[in-house]
From Swiss-Prot:
PANTHER family: SUGAR FERMENTATION STIMULATION PROTEIN A. GO terms for molecular function: DNA binding. CDD domains: SfsA-like_bacterial. It comes from Salmonella typhi. This is Sugar fermentation stimulation protein A. Belongs to the SfsA family. NCBIfam families: sfsA. Pfam families: SfsA, SfsA_N.
Length: 234
């Protein structure tokens, strides 16, 4: 994924009201950015960090600038736009960069499924193969080199795991992909210290046939690409 037009650089003043952030540009202008992230963003929004933002051509948007990346004061890159996790995963599947998800010729997005009336991020299909249901989660919480999900209690995430267990029980392929969008992370675990229920459900899901995968993205201010498998400890 290439950023076109190129991202612009600023310095973070503060994030507030979950969806807004104030930054100051190199010429001293103060801007308010849209922050497309509902999580705690722990370690991703420290005042003084470098922010890389995109600008929409939609003149009707109240906040035309979108916070895409954080470049921390220690030099790590973090993609804070959670929408990018799905985009990167879709691109990687279509370009056959994820061998575990190769071999399908149809990819559908936001398909309704499950007893709890959810929407799956992706459903892959191919002749003579079971349908493959994929839920994608963005991983940005880092403690040293360890990456964790979630960064806050997520009842929605718990629901998705229950739905995937139902998919596996019905004979389909069920997969949860953790997209690691933090350059300092080298391994992944569920955040038991934040959401013990989610961690327990993830282990249960794996035991009941749900595949758990984690891939890391190469991140820069010019492009992003999901391709590197990350070790998982449940």
């Amino acid at each position: 994924m290439l950023f076109s037009p190129p991202l612009q650089r600023a310095t973070l003043i503060q994030r507030y009201k979950r969806f807004l952030a104030d930054v100051i540009t190199p010429d001293g202008t103060t801007l308010t950015l849209h922050c497309p992230n509902t999580g705690a963003m722990t370690g991703c929004a420290t005042p003084g960090d470098t922010v890389w933002y995109s600008t929409s051509e939609n003149t009707k948007r109240k906040y035309p600038h979108t916070w895409e990346l954080t470049e921390t004061q220690s030099g790590a890159f973090i993609c804070v736009n959670t929408l990018r996790a799905n985009q990167l995963t879709k691109e990687a599947i279509q370009e056959n960069r994820l061998p575990a998800l190769a071999g399908y010729n149809i990819l559908n997005s936001e398909v309704k499924y499950g007893a709890e009336r959810s929407r799956i991020d992706f459903m892959l299909q191919a002749d003579f193969r079971p349908d493959c249901y994929i839920e994608v989660k963005s991983v940005t919480l880092a403690e040293k080199e360890n990456g964790y999900f979630p960064d806050a209690i997520t009842e929605r995430g718990q629901k998705h795991l229950r739905e995937l267990m139902g998919v596996a029980a019905a004979g389909h392929r069920a997969v949860v992909v953790f997209a690691v969008l933090h350059s300092a992370i080298t391994r992944f675990s569920p955040a038991r210290h934040i959401d013990i229920k989610y961690a327990q459900l993830l282990s249960e899901a794996q035991n009941k046939g749900v595949e758990v995968l984690a891939y890391k993205a190469e991140l820069s201010a010019t492009k992003m690409e999901l391709n590197e498998p990350v070790p998982i400890t449940l």
